[in-house]
Amino acid sequence: MSIKFTTLLAVLFALLAYARAQAERRHKLTRPVHRFAPNRPYLAGKRIVGGFVINISDAPYQISLQYDDDHNCGGSILSSKWILTAAHCINDNAPSKPTVRVGSSKHASGGTVIRVARIVPHPMHGSKNNYDIALLELKNELTFSEKVQPIALPEQDEPIEEGTMGIVSGWGLTLSEADSNDVLRATNVPTVNQQECNKAYQSRYGGITDQMFCAGYKQGGQDTCRQDSGGPFVAKGKLIGVISWGHECALAGYPGVYARVASVRDWIRTTSGV
């Protein structure tokens, strides 16, 4: 009798362990992928897929956000003292504050490296990717040049028309051995219908919010990817989006998801004066 009872307990424990493992596996498969890849145990980021090489003078507002001299995310220059990036790019457990490299087409050399003095994530940012925005105050002011320039911002709640073409840029994963991410790359993608994007992400991630918008092609092929996070989506000369997350990279039916800058314009102005 005791042997049968022991055997039954062993079977029950085995079934519970299997169920737990399957649940953890499903959780891993359905988590949204931030556009930012791990170079350190405490870091995570993404890169441009299906794009082309550009010079920093073509996107002089682009910066590389770095921890321990390693590129981890992108960002955009708002003024001589302020940078806009994604809140999920900020790591509170890092041993030191990050730095930014400006004015260089390469994330590992050239330009100027400046330490971040203060990090201000949006107060509404949480675990569900909403309000994925953070401001970085620099220790020293930038000197503007052909390669270092601020980008204009939209007004609060300024609408984005469906099909608006924007340019995204960064040093993220290219998914191609032939395309190096050592130099700055970019691609052009159109914004997509908000309801259609929400439907695409509903079953896996619970959809998107009004503080987000999506951009990409139905067939996939062009997108941002790991270590592009925090970088710019620029349309008509304005920074309308911050690279945030998505399901894998450049997959058909899953456009990239961006934090909507117009939804936090007043907060940016109040916090930075820009």
UniProtKB/Swiss-Prot annotation:
Its EC number is 3.4.21.4. The record marks 223 as: Required for specificity. It is an enzyme of class 3 (hydrolase). Residues 48-273 form the Peptidase S1 domain. GO terms for biological process: digestion; proteolysis. Disulfide bonds join 73-89, 197-214, 225-249. Residues 22-47 form a propeptide. One of its GO terms (cellular component) is extracellular region. Pfam families: Trypsin. It comes from the Eukaryota. The active site is at 88 (charge relay system), 132 (charge relay system), 229 (charge relay system). Transmembrane segments: none annotated. Residues 1-21 form the signal peptide. Keywords: Cleavage on pair of basic residues, Digestion, Disulfide bond, Hydrolase, Protease, Secreted, Serine protease, Signal, Zymogen. Expressed in the midgut. Expression levels drop a few hours after blood feeding and pick up again 28 hours later. One of its GO terms (molecular function) is serine-type endopeptidase activity. It catalyses: Preferential cleavage: Arg-|-Xaa, Lys-|-Xaa. It is found in: Secreted. SUPFAM superfamilies: Trypsin-like serine proteases. Constitutive trypsin that is expressed 2 days after emergence, coinciding with host seeking behavior of the female. Belongs to the peptidase S1 family. This is Trypsin-5. It comes from Anopheles gambiae (African malaria mosquito).
